[in-house]
């Protein structure tokens, strides 16, 4: 079932993970799968010999990224296959997993480490002050810097939300018990002034343009050929042609009070 066992799906939030077909399938979700589903009649469950995970590689284009998606969820698959449901214990599994990760290091396997999540973007704009709050999916400690350098094991440990009132770049990483760090997440925090309001005579609707092609990154839009604009009544996402491309909407919205929208 894809909700548990399609491990080509990203293991964390979309804003922290490399490109994948879907996101939000953490280790705990895979571990929680029960091969002997209650939907199977009890007198037939003994026919279930195990489970499998699916690993599609449309987006996993290198061996290193394939390993990143496979591990450690493949270890969760192994345990859920041989462990009776009543003896499954995710907390016990993750404690033992920390030792297994060291073994994976010895074999140079590029496994996933939970990334610092929380902020929905890697550039945060504010007017007076702002607060950044972080967490990760396995409650590992995190370390961070605000001087532009990459965090090390000796860097400041994240313990409370970060209150910010000046321009700064926050770099933060998750730290395993072994001292190994996750990839660094870098967030630019910028104090900005509000844009002046635009007074313009408007009509109902939004201007829509479309471009075709396989577009995975914003930079892929450079040099794109856009269709002639048309006015639509709302944000419609039903494509006129095969759904490979991007939409660009242009319009105005009413701002009732000063703020960041």
For the regions a language model picked out, list residue spans one by one:
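Extended extracellular/luminal ectodomain segments enriched in beta-structured repeat modules
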Residues: 244-246, 254-261
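Short, compositionally stereotyped local motifs that mark structural "simplifiers"
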Residues: 84, 88, 94-210, 215-251
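Substrate-binding groove of N-acetylhexosamine-processing glycoside hydrolases
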Residues: 1-142, 249
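Bulky hydrophobic/aromatic packing residues
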Residues: 45, 161-162, 259
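Polar low-complexity intrinsically disordered regions enriched in Ser/Thr and small residues
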Residues: 13-15, 27, 151, 182, ...
């Amino acid at each position: 079932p894809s909700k548990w066992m399609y491990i080509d799906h990203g293991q964390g939030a979309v804003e922290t993970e490399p490109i994948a077909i879907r996101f939000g399938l953490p280790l705990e979700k895979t571990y929680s799968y029960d091969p002997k589903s209650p939907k199977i009649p009890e007198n037939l469950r003994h026919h279930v010999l195990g489970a499998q995970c699916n690993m599609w590689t449309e987006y996993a284009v290198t061996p290193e990224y394939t390993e990143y998606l496979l591990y450690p969820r493949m270890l969760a698959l192994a345990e859920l296959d041989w462990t009776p449901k009543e003896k499954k214990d995710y907390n016990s599994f993750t404690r033992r997993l920390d030792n297994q990760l060291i073994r994976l290091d010895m074999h140079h396997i590029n496994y996933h480490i939970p990334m610092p999540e929380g902020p929905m973007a890697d550039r945060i704009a504010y007017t007076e002050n702002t607060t950044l709050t972080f967490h990760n999916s396995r409650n590992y400690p995190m370390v961070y810097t605000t001087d532009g350098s990459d965090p090390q094991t000796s860097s400041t440990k994240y313990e409370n939300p970060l209150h910010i009132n000046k321009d700064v770049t926050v770099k933060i990483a998750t730290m395993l018990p072994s001292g190994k760090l996750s990839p660094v997440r870098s967030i630019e925090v910028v104090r900005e002034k509000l844009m002046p309001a635009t007074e313009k005579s408007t009509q109902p609707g939004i201007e829509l343009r479309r471009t075709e092609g396989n577009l995975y990154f914003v930079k892929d839009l450079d040099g794109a050929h856009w269709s002639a604009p048309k006015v639509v009544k709302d944000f419609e996402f039903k494509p006129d042609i095969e759904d490979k491309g991007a939409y660009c909407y242009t319009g105005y919205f009413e701002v009732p009070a000063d703020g960041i929208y």
